[in-house]
């Protein structure tokens, strides 16, 4: 396709039915037919592959090298010799390797066999390989060295990575191994569940960013809100953030965080420790030729004088390093035999600008550049960088995060060995470093299982880390790769989250769609609601680099283009342009020269003839401006960068651009927009800014934007086809559409991604007409005959696990066995169950039916487990699962897969592909449906009021295109932006309809199904692709008359699963009060809830002091008030004290007994009232706090 070729050249897609069928019957034996699918998942797979392959033996080996050695001594200091250390032992890991998943089935010394992912899914286990570490220990600096390979437990392995058996398999072989023909990988299988590490947005690596943050001022008395922050990344992808703070007295402080603690160091201390530079050299390095800038020179003078004043004793580099070493010895856990000077060097290596390794001169140059940038920010010469802009962001890939955690766990492992030996030394136990047996004894006491910690991370998404890994969150790293349908599945791999820290922020600035993200993040595909703008998806052409480009020859190229090397130039003024390569200052040149260098490099890299200049090199030239971004030429070739292809006009070839450089480039969207001497690039297609899902919305350029956002969400909730190999999966719940079709109207990308292998809906004849009145409020009417012929007929598969071993302890003998015993049991059970006690495949089960039988040795009795769901089902499949740790144990664990039929019901949710969702309100008999002159009856009727306010014109266009496509037997291309104001879709598809003998506008005269008369208006009717969503009334309806209640409050429990009730909340109560329906209110809130009858005393008004008396022979139980009654003995005393003639005679009927033999008199003035039980509960709770409730009782 040449640059000027119009985009609308070919508007007819192909159905490719036979080609697809042939590919389905015999999958390709070489490579996949859909390379785009693999590209979509590449960032995940590529980042995991980088752990074990690449420079230095992969990231895990680089990480092990970076950890270095842990040192321990076997000597104990005494009073005579306080510095005695003894023999020195240095522990290190020299090699890390990961095997492919294997299993010996619990039989020791047996040959291992390959384990494939389908088995892990089916058996609900974890797909994992062994993590092997080569542990080295040397005594007294190499006097004797030993090494041993340690098995650190099984580590979960990513599918389709280089450690997976499926790697490089052809579609044919994948099918043979019970996978989809295009198994993408990119996820892990943990306990049978597919888990995915989601991508996160982090700050761009190795680039100093000027920030104004009010929280900076809270760090201390004279701190200001100005700072320069750099996130430095080591070769093993772990990062360390360094920040420079500006203080109001002109000082600058260097801040870093180590093991979740923050430390602040004066920046001059760091500069003096890096090189033996004099004050004059530091002054020149920061000010350069800009000596007239009094703002800068005054502050620098304060900075240097302040250092002299505060640390007069530090005169040279050695003293500074010793001072730093002394202060940070404990923090860095340095070994006792290291001098302070060496600890100071270790501090610089581990914390200060770690991406520059041990190059202290480069670090010093970079630090001076950062100080200069900080002063420019304070002076207002440059603006702060926006951390929310894609320009200053990169992606934290799942594989790299996984590697970081493994590295940290290896370091903890070494630390634990060291602590164990130290504990032995302190206890005075015999310690011999040269004895291999002693070391073996130590190692057996250490928990070596690193794999289980990674499995915990994947299954919960929680990060347990000592250092925090320089990240802002501790949870939410993993998600389940749900296979509701294929759209949902593929979206997981293109999803990128801003971080859970930002979800709690009250401000909306982080959620805004910024123009910098053009072509990298999709503007449409983000959820509505709380994660809006935080959870984004990549544009479908956006790639993420998982390898480091070879940039070793670039400095030489730059010098040949007129850049002066950094070593020769001390000046750092704004008159010069700083040239940086991956965070290292290469040299300086003038701003005019900088632009020429950038343009020349771009021409050369696209031309591809210059050796050592990779195509994906990012060339970000920031021109000098007044109060704009800090100028310079920044080159990037590292990992984790977002990249996308555009066409480079001077050479008419593909160029790869990144978000940093794109801001300062002129890229035309369409060839028509190109202006000479302005635009250097043009987009391959305007749809490159959209994600995969947003591209599949037909004619999305005709819709109002929120509707396209809704469709991106609803496409993922569709009851579609999650995959073809459903019989080899045991998901808790799977949705499947039985009658899926290929859409007549589809975007070109639909075929490129092979979406026809996973149909997601049905082509329906849709009439837009207000008919029957059942279509109000977005409801839709379905033709009863269409429903009977299978319109949107779906199935739900549910899996139930039955484990007999749960009731017995570990190591106990098996007491429960599947099958029938010799005791008596109902013979009807055999109608549903086989002789082995397992259900018959294909049998129909209802609530209460037996699903398996087992014999219990302890009770000598046959028992059954029953089907609990109220929805009838068919037994689809029974899987017998063996024990992982013991191959020969008898069967204890099975899974049963149920097939539940789901015919569209009234109340089920449907939607078109334009965010037009609605529920089915009626299934209308065919005889009563309106029909057209050609005898066509609509499958679906929707109300015309659904369109005006929502402005989904794309649905009208789809209806036209679908009708024309159905009449001519062609597929229609619905790619956005193929039409224009002059060339409209109404004309294009209208002509097709005319040729087929239909109305140009898509309207047709229709006849009433009830009377047979022609309707007065012509009806808009056409073919629209409809999706059935997973929100079905059968999963949602909740109804109960009586059922379980809460034991404390006696009110109905909540939750549909537990047969709970529906809560009448405050709003509902207010509505009932507002309507004056007091009887309804009493019925709902009392009689139907926690109605109870309680005795209350009329005199003291208490419900807690009443109790029933012990009945006498021939008399009824009476309710008495314990508080108002007096004891029988007291009553007798009162009588004997009264000497008057009319002394009271106690009547027998007044005397009553409580349950403990105590006699009382009186307290009989009680009555029974109806109250909510929760009132009784409240009363007793208040009584516990010493508060008495008194009720006024009507004497009647």
UniProtKB/Swiss-Prot annotation:
InterPro entries tied to this protein: DNA-dir_RNA_pol_su2 (IPR015712), DNA-dir_RNAP_su2_dom (IPR007120), DNA-dir_RNAP_su2_hyb_sf (IPR037033), RNA_pol_bsu_CS (IPR007121), RNA_pol_bsu_protrusion (IPR007644), RNA_pol_Rpb2_2 (IPR007642), RNA_pol_Rpb2_2_sf (IPR037034), RNA_pol_Rpb2_3 (IPR007645)
GO molecular function, one term: ribonucleoside binding
Keyword Nucleus: yes
CDD domains per UniProt: RNA_pol_B_RPB2 (cd00653)
Any Pfam family matching the protein: RNA_pol_Rpb2_2
Gene Ontology CC annotations of this record: mitochondrion; RNA polymerase I complex
TM region(s), chain numbering: none
Assembly behavior: Component of the RNA polymerase I (Pol I) complex consisting of 14 subunits.
Protein name from the UniProt record: DNA-directed RNA polymerase I subunit RPA2
Source organism per UniProt: Eremothecium gossypii (strain ATCC 10895 / CBS 109.51 / FGSC 9923 / NRRL Y-1056) (Yeast)
UniProt lineage: Eukaryota, Fungi, Dikarya, Ascomycota, Saccharomycotina
